[in-house]
Amino acid sequence: MKRTYQPNKRKRSKVHGFRARMSTRNGRKVLARRRRKGRKVLSA
């Protein structure tokens, strides 16, 4: 059986990237939460 994590930069940013987060209402909520918490890195 192959491993579940097969790194791919393009997919990573398409799914978890900043622009992906900004494109939906819930994604913007995620960023707002992470800003409020004081996360150094907001998105992948």
Curated annotation (Swiss-Prot):
One of its GO terms (molecular function) is structural constituent of ribosome. Keywords: Ribonucleoprotein, Ribosomal protein. Residues 1-44 are annotated as: Disordered. The keyword Ribosomal protein applies. One of its GO terms (biological process) is translation. One of its GO terms (cellular component) is ribosome. The keyword Ribosomal protein applies. It holds the Pfam family Ribosomal_L34. It comes from the Bacteria. Residues 1-19, 26-44 have a biased composition (Basic residues). Belongs to the bacterial ribosomal protein bL34 family. This is Large ribosomal subunit protein bL34. It comes from Geobacillus sp. (strain WCH70).
